[in-house]
Amino acid sequence: MEFIDLARNRFSERSFSSAPLEEEKLYKILEAGRIAPTACNNQPQRFYVLKSKEALAKAAKLTYTYNAPVVILVCYVNAEAWHNPRDGFCSGDMDASIAASSMMFEAEDLGVHSIWLRGFDAGSVHQVFSLPDGTVPSLMLALGYPGEKSAPHKLHTMREPMEEFVVEL
């Protein structure tokens, strides 16, 4: 499948089955995040894999996880992220997002569905999972196979025309 078709067909899964995710597929998904581009190749991204009942229950109290069998907590280490000397911009959240996007599309290519989650308080996530100081939670990526009610959201195919996004200067 061409990438554009993969990107067009992928949707945020809101109905996961209880089927476990194979370790081989999880490894490939994590590898896609590991090799993702980062600012200055600093590689500040960190992945915390939540798959025990206890860890998944903690995540579900912090944000809606749709009963996914695996959730990857995507973080970055602030001290390892690139900081723009001109304006102080920190690349960490952007680097973590690029890694998560790579994992999301690798998952889709493997037949694994996903949903990007950010409806949580980062301080609470840091505390609940006892993250190291300087590690910043960026997002969670829920992974698994589609459940019985799996379907794209009604807004999935609604896209603005190209002219709304592109300006030639």
Indicate where each model-derived feature is located.
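Short coil/turn connectors at secondary-structure junctions
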Residues: 66-70, 112, 133-137
